[in-house]
Amino acid sequence: MGTVNVVNVAKKHQFSWYEKFYFWSIGKGLWITLKHFVKVAFFNKQVTIEYPDKKRQYSTRFRGMHSMKRDEQGRERCTACFCCMWICPANAIHIEAAEVTAERQHLHPEDKYAKKFEINLLRCIFCGLCEEACPKGAIYLDGTGEMAADNREDLFLTKERMMEKTGGPILGQRN
């Protein structure tokens, strides 16, 4: 067997003087800090909002808390088709379906309804895919952004907490 010549192709990168001492990165960070300092100190631009006293203004396109809408007759729009659950990239939605009985027929437009509908806000990334996937327009991400909670159980939204009140405004389309 013959010998094999091995060639080492790895090169060591030679850092320049400012890369060696990280002056460039430190200077960029200090420049950003100095810009914020000048805005706040000399131009009186507030960065922080005093939350309980002042409320933040949200855009009309803001995706906030989840809500479930009713149709024009006050019935639940959700028909437990599982589209929102399947499309959720964070697996934050859990639905259990049930058949509509004769005594509940006035509450649901279809033959199937969501017996249990939960959204785990600890997992939700508020991407809005559930809203886009819903063929009935049952789930919306409305503009309310106050989601502070004292315990983990408050961050699990149930159907009862999300459902629009009977006789409330019917929101059909997002502007």
Swiss-Prot record:
Q: Which PROSITE patterns match?
A: 4FE4S_FER_1, 4FE4S_FER_2
Q: Name one GO molecular function term.
A: NADH:ubiquinone reductase (non-electrogenic) activity
Q: Which GO terms describe its biological process?
A: aerobic respiration
Q: What does the record give as EC number?
A: 7.1.1.-
Cofactor(s) listed: [4Fe-4S] cluster
Q: Does the keyword Endoplasmic reticulum apply?
A: no
Subunit info?
Answer: NDH-1 is composed of 14 different subunits. Subunits NuoA, H, J, K, L, M, N constitute the membrane sector of the complex.
Which protein family is named in the record?
A: Belongs to the complex I 23 kDa subunit family.
What is the annotated role of this protein in its UniProt record?
NDH-1 shuttles electrons from NADH, via FMN and iron-sulfur (Fe-S) centers, to quinones in the respiratory chain. The immediate electron acceptor for the enzyme in this species is believed to be ubiquinone. Couples the redox reaction to proton translocation (for every two electrons transferred, four hydrogen ions are translocated across the cytoplasmic membrane), and thus conserves the redox energy in a proton gradient.
Q: What is this protein identified as?
A: NADH-quinone oxidoreductase subunit I
Q: What is the native source organism of this protein?
A: Leptospira biflexa serovar Patoc (strain Patoc 1 / ATCC 23582 / Paris)
Its organism's taxonomic lineage begins at:
Bacteria, Pseudomonadati, Spirochaetota, Spirochaetia, Leptospirales
